[in-house]
């Protein structure tokens, strides 16, 4: 369904707003259910515009997420793109090779302009990178000046691909280099046209982005490539019926065939530069490995989509696929985990982290977390009995009366759960991955080690002298440099937090876990209060923090 807000209006180039009056074929403010064809037509009625008005914007209310169409020219003619002569006349060097794939600190300076931008557009513009040590995707918001110009600096640790987003749903990838400078003239209307189902068939109005500077030719190839070979790995493009009820072996064969077909298409197309082909090959390697590693979750998703059952019931009925002993031999076959070339891709760190959680057959002592917890002398007799009862209920397929209590024990014995998880990861790395690669050395294993220290810092735990002694043993100085900076920032944050004022610590005293919330709020009985619970790793929590700032000021 769609819905047109009754607060919609037209903003004309004379500065006046013309509020919507009514809809013909649609009722304003109510859900309009789309037919199965996905196509429908209706009219929106606005006041008569003065004859002097040439350009309008359609604005569906003033909220950030509301739909907007900017720069509608009433005569149907678009003005010429305002490109500088330097951009028009420049000659790009498509023979330029990719820079060396290595760990190298530096900032990439990004400058440019959003073509056709008006100051009231207020389009969000950002750059997304994947941090190599935390494996977190981080967004850098880019300030756009009233004339559409912008400048930002992106911290990098290697030449790599990043993703830019402009507006609501428009994304494009860019290759950046530490120490490099890249200028981008972003053609807003062509980016919009190329994403529109209705306008895709119309003639392009120039390039989506015009590049000059570091690796400009490669970025030009990336932005003008309409074959989109990597779409084969995008879940939105998958035919889930192909995957529905597949065995793990069929799933593996299916994607390895796609991988070889894509690889062949990349290598055979000599129109692309060698640099671009090498980048595409690296992306193909990465995305195939990610897709194969996510066999269980992807087959579960296909089952939910195609089974015809309600989602919750489908997930409950889905049976985890049986993995053969040689299922993961694609690790040896593709042989990319240790390759520095993976640094070119925007997601290698995500792969490195995810490989530590593969579903594999464990040794007996690592196959039962309950047995591990119960074997610890840190667990009290009373808690051990609850854990046994919970396990018995779970094994019998029953909903345990101790489910809520088990959640509390999960938090209480968090260190034991983390220890067990760490032991499982070590088994996967040393027995499975190292077995297929024939080594425990290399970039992949270095990152696995260093990610543990980065996670410690992310958990607000400063590194110890012993930690730094271990980090200094690494052959690449990047790790010591980066983790030292991360640790210093954490120490500065901790000290700054100690000096903060303007808040009151609400002492709850010694209370049971289930009584904590009541203890916090009981002192304010009869008053309206805002209680903000959040977690640093939680995406929705982070979004809510921004939304709640005005409430906290009130």
Give residue spans per PLM region.
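Conserved redox-active cysteine motifs that mediate thiol-disulfide chemistry
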Residues: 525, 533-550
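Pro/Ala/Gly-rich low-complexity, hydrophilic intrinsically disordered segments
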Residues: 69-102, 485-507, 517
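Short, surface-exposed ligand- or partner-binding patches at beta-edge/loop junctions that are enriched
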Residues: 49-67, 162-167
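Solvent-exposed beta-hairpin/edge-strand motifs
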Residues: 2-24, 64-73
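Oxidative protein folding and maturation machinery
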Residues: 195-526
